[in-house]
Amino acid sequence: MLLRDVKPADLDAYVRMRCDPVMMSELGGPQPRERIAGQLRRDLETVREDSAWIKMVVAGDSAQVAGTVTLYPHEGISEIGWMVLPEFQGRGLAGEAVRQVLDLARADGRWGLIHAFPSTTNAASNAICRSAGFSLIGQEETTFAGRIFQTSHWVFDSSAHA
């Protein structure tokens, strides 16, 4: 598994991840396809500015994108999120990618407390939080892409895990 920064050629992967009803079922449903190119442009700019990390998860020795892990400032906190395409799920890629990003965050030193908000019904993502060393704070309503849903609120102190 390899992590790399998002690049312009990732538009198809963005569409596959964000417009698919199965992929987005735990995030309030699919996003409109016409918004995805703009999202990619904004993400590329954030990576250029180094204000967020948007890492594409590449499976094995192939160049095929399997998913993404993002770490970004959001409403005064550092937030991490991830998704893996259905055909790559169940291989441990998301867990490995999240742990690698947390290792990078520890070394970088600027992220402090890192929050994750998986849907309360997303057993796999909640298990990743647990196994990666996050502490469960509680449950709350979260808005993502204009949709409200119930999430588990996890926190990881990247400075305490140095």
Language model regions located:
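Positions that flank functional sites
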Residues: T121, F144
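Residues that scaffold the ATP/ADP-binding catalytic core of kinase and kinase-like folds
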Residues: E26-L27, R91, I137
